[in-house]
Amino acid sequence: MKAIIITIGDEILLGQILDTNSQYISRQLTRLGAEVADILSIADQREEIWQWVDYAMKQAELIIVTGGLGPTKDDVTKKVLAEYFDTRL
């Protein structure tokens, strides 16, 4: 199974925090027999989230999105994913 991990957060891109989630998730997926095809770190921006989720949907059977769910107004991940998948979260 081909997997893509998407980590969302300006803090990661700015080097303010370390992305340990992707490292852990990748190790576990590999242990379970999945092929991690890509690990993406992207900004907390609607267009970027939409673009990379759309890319991942066309490339992988499993997509894991982590981050982008903090209390600040720039954390729009939940809203964008609900719109993308045309559902409530």
PLM ranges: what are they?
Residues 1-89:
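Non-catalytic beta/alpha edge segments that cap or flank active sites
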